[in-house]
A protein has these predicted regions:
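N-terminal first-folded block
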Residues: 1-27
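Long, charge-rich, low-complexity alpha-helical segments
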Residues: 29-82
Length: 82
């Protein structure tokens, strides 16, 4: 599956979850899925809990986050030592 095909699984609609990106056909936000992964859930566990999801949906969330970060500019923070 191409990146473009994966990203088609993510939609944004101001009327759904206040416009946050969601997996198409669900009310599951990309943010929520990434939070589950960040806290140790495996894709298989997420799919077991939300049986309408697929591996491709999980991959789409990760890819969406990656693409969102690609064009951002980050500024290093100055850290003072004591």
């Amino acid at each position: 599956m191409t990146d473009e095909q994966l990203l088609e699984r993510i939609t944004l609609d101001a009327k759904v979850m206040t416009g946050k990106p969601v997996i198409k056909g669900t009310r599951l936000t990309v943010e929520y899925v990434l939070n589950l992964l960040a806290h140790g859930a495996t894709p298989e566990e997420i799919i077991q809990e939300y049986d309408s999801l697929s591996q491709e949906d999980i991959r789409a969330c990760i890819l969406f986050a990656k693409k969102s970060l690609e064009d951002m500019t980050f500024m290093p923070l100055a850290v003072e030592t004591v």
